[in-house]
Amino acid sequence: MAILFAVVARGTTILAKHAWCGGNFLEVTEQILAKIPSENNKLTYSHGNYLFHYICQDRIVYLCITDDDFERSRAFNFLNEIKKRFQTTYGSRAQTALPYAMNSEFSSVLAAQLKHHSENKGLDKVMETQAQVDELKGIMVRNIDLVAQRGERLELLIDKTENLVDSSVTFKTTSRNLARAMCMKNLKLTIIIIIISVVFIYIIVSPLCGGFTWPNCVKK
């Protein structure tokens, strides 16, 4: 399983985000962010088959969405790493930044860390201290009901095939570029062979025609 979505926000103002796959993440995230108090806190919300983990510090919320069987320790390791990198990079600028002001830069950081913490299953066993384990025990898990603006019950809808489609497009593009490169390589090789053949024929025929200017073979 993987971390499906990550976002950094100030209250309900999203500053940066990244999604591992397709889904109505923003619609659901807006509902979650509206329920998070502004004081420093750590909490996990449970909704259906998904968990919403967050750390709120200095009014900045670091939140990620995972499957319900994804280890919470790994999720909070991810959030702590994101928090550290975000604070180091932006500091107090985040307190007055406009929506998505950091997205162009920080979304790539979210993507890299999301991939890293999703794939390294042994990460929490190697890096966690006992203090981190004890801290995790103090982070509550609460069930949460989400309601859309229409008043309907809001469910998190995820399309993991979008990630597969992106991978397929990347593979096709790479294959196309490789084929084009091979074609150019073969064309260059063919041209070189033709040039060498012409030079070789010229050298062989020149003595028979009286020299390099072919005086005996070319009519004046």
From Swiss-Prot:
Major localization class: membrane
GO terms for biological process, alphabetical: calcium-ion regulated exocytosis; endoplasmic reticulum to Golgi vesicle-mediated transport; endosome to lysosome transport; eosinophil degranulation; exocytosis; neutrophil degranulation; phagocytosis, engulfment; protein transport
Gene3D superfamilies given in the database record: 1.20.5.110, Longin domain (3.30.450.50)
Residue numbers on the Cytoplasmic membrane side: 2-188
Record-listed N-acetylalanine modification sites: 2
Stated role: Involved in the targeting and/or fusion of transport vesicles to their target membrane during transport of proteins from the early endosome to the lysosome. Required for heterotypic fusion of late endosomes with lysosomes and homotypic lysosomal fusion. Required for calcium regulated lysosomal exocytosis. Involved in the export of chylomicrons from the endoplasmic reticulum to the cis Golgi. Required for exocytosis of mediators during eosinophil and neutrophil degranulation, and target cell killing by natural killer cells.
Protein name: Vesicle-associated membrane protein 7
Organism: Bos taurus
